[in-house]
């Protein structure tokens, strides 16, 4: 015991030093208690004698199970902390020489102690594993313990003594006086006696025995035994599944009986160069395969680790079927985009049942019947060529009818037969009639009110490519639709340059038109009481032409277009000036009215300016005598006198 304690103290000191190098200080007593707890919860740990990260994680799992079972009261507080610290040391033992030395020393001590425990267990197989002695008795000398072991046990001494005595004093049953015993027993059944207040406890003469000693089992040996059993079970299951697959192939006639007895080495290989097999999404576990598979899935073939080929069904991707259905509805069954999806699906191994199910799901009833008739016709032509070639692939195999109506039989077809079915199905699809207007879906692509013009053009080009196969073929049509299906703001920006630039020019012109531009147009239209479209049309209207005819190059007074005269002009009535004749008053030239009275002359322009002040000369004025013979003198007023100089200032206002 002292040697074991010294060894424990030795590797505890090693661990303390290793933890100290990492800046962690721990107490030696706490580590000793921790390893005692490890030994109690994980008795296998000292026996294996190896410390690595895998075994140390097993110790952590044991701690967690112990915690879940007995609760936090039964586990030391520092148990998980020390476990994490030692885990970090084990993870980095390669980089630290001191930690490596501590782990190596601990493994040696564990191996020595485990060997000592095994030798002690082999010599003392009948030793009681549960000690009934107290902790104080364990501290006594070994001599005292030997003396105490020779004494009788302290617990239940009377029962054990009676048991030992009775084993020697049991009488022979043949010598018992049974009549006397019955008379004595009858005395204990007197009805006049009062009943017992309580039944006496049953007397158990068997002494409490210690639990049996369990033999120490090496966990490595037990694990190896379980692994060998599992490997044997896996081999038998693989053999069983391979026999089932081979039996199905023999029933369908796709496998020839060979003299080779190695069933696991059988695998299907390509029969001609360049032939490729469809790849499955993952390797299927043969233990979980379901037979028979569902009847609506394409066939895939995978290879396991031993080279064995396994065929199974994987489900159609729902997004692919949805995309094909959408393409058929929007662009038509024979559009290039739709045919591209069909060809991508046909790259897999599809049985005739798979093709029939797929076509029925995405095409209308009439188109499905047309496809089926074309498919059968193609299969008849292919079957005739196969008959001439002598490969045995007849009409029933190509169409999945007759003896090959079951999907299990179709699943075992050769790759060449799958290729013939693919060609017949895709050729039948290409012969479907064109319905409706292919450009109807293209004209339905319109720009949203807040959608950028570049995104709208991209949608337009994508749709045109799916309909025409090549967007360059309908570039003029796309350019026209880019203007007609654009929103009013983009149309107003493109209109002046519509015939002067191409589609890229349209994109440049509308690159700045965004939500803020649309908001400004809406506000301007609201203030002007117009719609956005009317506002943009009036804004771009040219006002530089003739007001009379609207043409450029002349004014209204020079316009020679007499066809635009207003036919609804008023006819002048009776002249208000002369009261005779129908003409306008400003055009009246009469001197008298209808009564013969003279009419005043016209007053010129009819506009009179500001009256002027009388003109008067100040200062010396020369006098000209009046001459009656002057023809220009028509004044009657008397002649003015000669004015002298005056000091009167001129008038301030006229």
From Swiss-Prot:
A lipid is attached at residue 2 (N-myristoyl glycine). One of its GO terms (molecular function) is nucleic acid binding. The keyword Isomerase does not apply. A zinc finger (CCHC-type) spans 544-561, 573-590. InterPro entries: B_retro_matrix, B_retro_matrix_sf, Gag_p24_C, Primate_lentivir_Gag_pol-like, Retrov_capsid_C, Retrov_capsid_N, Retrovr_matrix, Znf_CCHC. GO terms for cellular component: viral nucleocapsid. The record marks 100-101, 160-161, 214-215, 297-298, 523-524, 618-619 as: Cleavage. This is Gag polyprotein.
């Amino acid at each position: 015991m002292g040697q074991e304690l010294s060894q424990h103290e030795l590797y505890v000191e090693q661990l303390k030093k290793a933890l100290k190098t990492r800046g962690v200080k721990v107490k030696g007593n706490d580590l000793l208690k921790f390893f005692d707890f490890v030994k109690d919860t994980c008795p296998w740990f000292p026996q294996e004698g190896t410390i690595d990260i895998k075994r140390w994680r097993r110790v952590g799992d044991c701690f967690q199970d112990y915690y879940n079972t007995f609760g936090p009261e039964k586990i030391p507080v520092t148990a998980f902390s020390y476990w994490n610290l030692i885990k970090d040391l084990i993870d980095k033992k390669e980089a630290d020489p001191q930690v490596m030395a501590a782990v190596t020393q601990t493994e040696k001590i564990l191996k020595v102690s485990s060997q000592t425990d095994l030798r002690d267990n082999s010599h003392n197989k009948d030793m009681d594993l549960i000690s009934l002695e107290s902790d104080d008795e364990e501290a006594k000398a070994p001599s005292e313990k030997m003396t105490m072991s020779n004494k009788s046990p302290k617990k239940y001494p009377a029962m054990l003594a009676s048991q030992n005595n009775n084993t020697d004093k049991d009488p022979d049953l043949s010598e018992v006086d049974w009549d006397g015993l019955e008379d004595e027993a009858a005395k204990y059944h007197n009805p006049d006696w009062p009943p017992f207040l309580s039944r006496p406890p049953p007397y158990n003469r068997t002494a409490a025995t210690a639990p049996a000693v369990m033999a120490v089992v090496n966990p490595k040996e037990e694990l190896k035994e379980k692994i060998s059993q599992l490997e044997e079970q896996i081999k038998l299951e693989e053999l069983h599944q391979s026999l089932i697959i081979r039996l199905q192939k023999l029933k369908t006639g796709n496998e020839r009986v060979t003299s080779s007895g190695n069933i696991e080495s059988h695998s299907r290989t390509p029969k001609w160069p360049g032939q490729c097999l469809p790849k499955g999404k993952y390797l299927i576990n043969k233990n979980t395969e379901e037979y028979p598979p569902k009847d609506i899935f394409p066939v895939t073939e995978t290879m396991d680790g031993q080279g064995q080929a396994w065929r199974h069904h994987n489900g159609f991707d729902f997004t692919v079927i949805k995309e094909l259905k959408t393409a058929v509805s929007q662009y038509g069954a024979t559009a290039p985009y739709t045919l591209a999806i069909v060809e991508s699906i046909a790259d897999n191994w599809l049985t005739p049942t798979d093709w029939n199910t797929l076509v029925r799901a995405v095409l209308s009833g009439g188109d499905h019947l047309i496809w089926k008739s074309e498919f059968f016709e193609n299969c008849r032509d292919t079957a005739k060529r196969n008959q001439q070639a002598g490969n045995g692939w007849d009409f029933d195999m190509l169409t999945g009818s007759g003896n090959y109506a079951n999907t299990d039989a179709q699943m075992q077809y050769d790759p060449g037969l799958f290729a013939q079915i693919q060609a017949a199905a895709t050729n039948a699809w290409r012969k479907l009639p064109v319905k409706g207007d292919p450009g109807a879906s293209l004209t339905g692509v319109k720009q949203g009110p807040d959608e950028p013009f570049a995104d709208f053009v991209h949608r337009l080009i994508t749709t045109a490519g799916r309909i025409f196969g090549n967007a360059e073929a309908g570039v003029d049509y796309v350019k026209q639709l880019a203007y007609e299906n654009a929103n009013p703001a983009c149309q107003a920006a493109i209109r002046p340059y519509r015939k002067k630039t191409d589609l890229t020019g349209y994109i440049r012109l509308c690159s700045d038109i965004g939500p803020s531009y649309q908001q400004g147009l809406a506000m301007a239209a609201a203030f002007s009481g117009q719609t956005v479209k009317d506002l943009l049309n009036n804004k771009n209207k040219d006002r530089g032409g003739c007001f009379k005819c609207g043409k450029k190059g002349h004014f209204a007074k020079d316009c020679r277009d007499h066809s635009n005269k207003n036919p609804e002009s008023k006819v002048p009535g009776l002249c208000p000036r002369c009261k005779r004749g129908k003409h306008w008053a400003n055009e009246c030239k009469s001197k008298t009215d209808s009564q013969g009275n003279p009419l005043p002359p016209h007053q010129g322009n009819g506009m009179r300016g500001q009256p002027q002040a009388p003109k008067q000369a100040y200062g010396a004025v020369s006098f000209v005598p009046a001459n009656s013979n002057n023809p220009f003198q028509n004044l009657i007023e008397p002649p003015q006198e000669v004015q002298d100089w005056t000091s009167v200032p001129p008038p301030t206002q006229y």
